[in-house]
Amino acid sequence: MAVPKRKTSKSNTKMRRAANSKMEATGFVSCPQCHEPKLPHRVCPDCGYYKGKEVVSK
C-alpha cells in the first residue's frame, strides 16, 4: 500500500483544497439615478451617486 514519504504542509493542503472552490465574479447592477451599469456597494462612476446622495461631484 502506498504511503506518503513526507508530511504534506498546511500550505500545500490549503492550496490544493482552494483550487476547487474558486470565487465567482460579482455581477453588475444598474444605478438607480442614471441606470448605467455599476459594481454593487460602490459609487456610480457616471453620475457620482451612492445610496441616493451625490458623493462625487461631476
Curated annotation (Swiss-Prot):
Keywords: Ribonucleoprotein, Ribosomal protein. GO terms for biological process: translation. One of its GO terms (molecular function) is structural constituent of ribosome. Residues 1-19 have a biased composition (Basic residues). Signal peptide: none annotated. GO terms for cellular component: large ribosomal subunit. The keyword Iron-sulfur does not apply. The keyword Ribosomal protein applies. Residues 1-22 are annotated as: Disordered. Belongs to the bacterial ribosomal protein bL32 family. HAMAP family: Ribosomal_bL32. This is Large ribosomal subunit protein bL32. It comes from Clostridioides difficile (strain 630). The lineage of its organism: Bacteria, Bacillati, Bacillota, Clostridia, Peptostreptococcales.
